[in-house]
Amino acid sequence: MKIGIIGVGLMGGSFALDFRSIYKNSKIYGFDVDIKNFQYSIDNKIVDELLSETNCKDLDFLIVSVPVHIIPDVVKKYLDFVGSNTLVIDLGSTKNSICNSLNDHPKRDQFLASHPIAGTENSGPKSAIKGLYTNSINIICCLLYTSPSPRDNTT
């Protein structure tokens, strides 16, 4: 399985650690605007290599774990790059503005809005915790707008 993670801090980094523990032979691509955070995530095997427009086409999932106010722009940009079977999932808290901004996107059906009820007061990849999402609730929003085909990958 191949996934991409945009934002390799607490939430994205923790997702990567848990994902790797379940899918041991997975490939995890990552990106962070802070080069030090990205390098830390590479050096500590949180992610395997840099996420690019090219390797986005072959992902099973793309996790967007960035500040809420930029999620709509990031999701729109990457929906244009991902393949037809890639599911893009955000980990932000608020959903109304995110979902409304994507209503007219041609690949809206490949986006799943989620709000994991998990976290700590810390940030950055050094605070990534294996098991952060264990026994946590994840609120899924606007599911009717997401295609069943990419959703099938989530089981």
PLM feature segments, named:
Residues 145-155:
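Single conserved hydrophobic/aromatic residue that forms the stacking wall/gate
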Residues 66, 92, 142:
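Glycine-rich, N-terminal phosphate-binding loop of Rossmann-like dinucleotide-binding domains
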Residues 29-31, 51, 89, 112, ...:
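Hydrophobic/aromatic beta-strand patches that form the interior of the parallel beta-sheet core
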Residues 1-50:
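NAD(P)+-binding Rossmann beta1-loop-alpha1 motif at the extreme N-terminus of oxidoreductases
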Residues 74-126:
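Rossmann-like NAD(P)(H) cofactor-binding subdomain of soluble oxidoreductases
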Residues 55-79, 87:
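Rossmann-like NAD(P)-binding element
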Residues 126-147:
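Short beta-strand and adjoining strand-loop segment in the mid-core
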